[in-house]
Design a protein with these regions (language model features):
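Short, polar/acidic, helix-capping and beta-turn segments at strand->helix junctions
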Residues: 1-110
C-alpha cells in the first residue's frame, strides 16, 4: 500500500506530484530545488541552493520518519559542471563519510 508524504516545511509541489511516497518501508522522494519554503524564493548562488535543497530533502525525510542516513541513492542536476566542487563541499557536510550512491549530470535550461 502506498502512503503519500506531504511536508509543510518544504516548498509546495509545483506540479502534480507528492513530496514523497512510502511503500513497503521504502521512501521515494521527489527532487528538490534550492527554494526557501518560507519565502518561495530560490536561494542565490550554487552553494546556497545546494544547502537549501538538502535542507528541504531532510525535512521531507523527517516528515516521513527517516533521516539523511537512510538515503541509498541521489541524483544531482547541475546547470554548470564547473559548480561540481562547490556542490560537493555542501553535499559532504550533509552526509559525513557514509555517502549514498550518486549520479551527477550537467543539464542545460534547468
Amino acid at each position: 500500500m502506498k502512503n503519500i508524504i506531504k511536508c509543510d516545511s518544504a516548498p509546495a509541489a509545483l506540479g502534480p506530484y507528492s513530496h514523497a511516497c512510502e511503500a513497503n518501508g521504502f521512501i521515494f522522494t521527489s527532487g528538490q530545488l534550492g527554494i526557501d519554503p518560507a519565502t518561495g524564493k530560490l536561494a542565490e548562488g550554487v552553494e546556497a541552493q545546494a544547502h537549501q535543497a538538502l535542507v528541504n530533502i531532510d525535512n521531507v525525510l523527517k516528515t516521513a520518519g527517516a533521516t539523511m542516513k537512510d538515503i541509498l541513492k541521489t541524483t544531482i542536476f547541475l546547470v554548470d559542471l564547473n559548480d561540481f566542487a562547490a556542490v560537493n563541499k555542501v553535499y559532504g557536510d550533509y552526509f559525513g563519510s557514509e555517502f549514498p550512491g550518486r549520479s551527477c549530470f550537467q543539464v542545460s535550461k534547468l
